[in-house]
């Protein structure tokens, strides 16, 4: 317990030091018509997840060196991208290289199954970017990461799929970030930046990868279902609208809630957090522990969330169209 208190204090100090550096170096996020915020805020506060991974490794003996190398690479490139925009090709190369390092740590780079490895790499990188796309309002990255990490910690208490200390240390990093980001619109001290949203995505996917490999059950991805539905269906929607997927937008369901419906950032983030917690805890404690039941639970939750997304968009998307039309006047 004392160790974790020390880690929390160190991370809190590190975040405050970063704020001084960001202020001095003008690492800021300026709002535009596609943003869900209206004031200039420090960017890159999510670097605390990378710092947390290093602090954890220092305290617990570097048990996952290849994971740490991948985390450092992907977060480092993302941080540079937060400061000055990098080409998409550079970001993707870093993401795939980092995923390979994570897979090496997971001991799944068996090239006799090369086609499965390639598919898994694409899913890993795709999921990383979807989690990144979902970072658009105060508190959503911090809150949702806790909604994923806490159930993971509960599962890991009994089965020991992965180092519990890594999960707890990442929870502490998320709590530190919550202190400065889980606030109403206009009140956040910092935003995560790509370094934060991509960094925490890398950690969560690595943790889930350990569980999936050791249980041989891919349905544990249900721990990311709420983000997955909003992220994937929004991509499908944008493809139907023939939009450039690389351009910024405000079409996610959570963005419609925060912008067009004027629901507070903290309320929207809390809703996403609560939905994921309910689904994950139900999966752990209510769903019978066999693969068939896991799949039925996953498919059922997926259908319910997807229907809710479609009905919500049908009812309220016209408000976003009106907003876009107003920009052209």
Each language-model region and where it sits:
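Small-residue-rich transmembrane alpha-helices that serve as helix-helix interface/gating elements
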Residues: 224, 293-309
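Cytosolic, membrane-interface loops and tails of multi-pass inner-membrane proteins
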Residues: 16-42, 235-266, 328
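Membrane-interface starts of transmembrane alpha-helices
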Residues: 87-91, 193, 263-271, 292-293
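Extracellular/periplasmic helix-loop-helix junctions in multi-pass membrane proteins
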Residues: 281-299
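Alpha-helical transmembrane segments of integral membrane proteins
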Residues: 251, 259-282, 287
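"…together with the soluble PPM/PP2C metallo-phosphatase catalytic core" -> "…together
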Residues: 1-232
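Membrane-interface capping segments at transmembrane-helix boundaries
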Residues: 20-25, 185-186, 239, 308-324
């Amino acid at each position: 317990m004392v160790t974790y208190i020390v880690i929390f204090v160190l991370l809190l100090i590190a975040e405050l030091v970063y704020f001084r550096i960001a202020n001095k170096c003008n690492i800021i996020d300026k709002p535009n018509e596609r943003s869900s915020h209206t004031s200039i805020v420090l960017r890159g506060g999510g670097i605390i997840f990378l710092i947390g991974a290093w602090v954890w490794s220092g305290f617990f003996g570097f048990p996952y060196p290849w994971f740490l190398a991948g985390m450092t690479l992907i977060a480092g490139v993302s941080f540079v991208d937060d400061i000055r925009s990098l080409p998409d090709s550079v970001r993707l190369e870093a993401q795939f290289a980092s995923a390979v390092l994570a897979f090496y740590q997971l001991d799944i780079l068996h090239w006799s199954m090369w086609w499965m490895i390639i598919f898994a790499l694409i899913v890993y990188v795709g999921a990383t970017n979807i989690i990144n796309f979902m970072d658009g309002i105060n508190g959503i990255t911090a809150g949702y990461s806790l909604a994923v990490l806490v159930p993971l910690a509960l599962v890991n208490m009994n089965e020991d799929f992965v180092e519990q200390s890594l999960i707890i240390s990442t929870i502490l990093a998320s709590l530190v970030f919550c202190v400065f980001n889980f606030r109403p619109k206009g009140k956040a001290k910092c935003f995560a930046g790509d370094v934060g949203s991509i960094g925490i995505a890398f950690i969560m996917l690595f943790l889930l990868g350990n569980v999936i490999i050791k249980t041989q059950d891919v349905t544990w991805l249900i721990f990311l279902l709420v983000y997955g539905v909003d992220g994937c269906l929004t991509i499908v929607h944008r493809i139907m609208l023939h939009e450039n997927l690389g351009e910024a937008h405000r079409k996610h369901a959570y963005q419609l809630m925060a912008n067009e419906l004027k629901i507070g950032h903290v309320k929207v983030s809390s809703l996403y957090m609560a939905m994921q917690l309910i689904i994950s805890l139900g999966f752990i404690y209510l769903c019978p522990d066999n693969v068939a039941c896991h799949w039925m639970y996953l498919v059922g939750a997926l259908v319910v969330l997807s229907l809710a997304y479609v009905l919500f968009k049908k009812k309220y998307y016209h408000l976003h169209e009106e907003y876009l039309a107003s920009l052209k006047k």
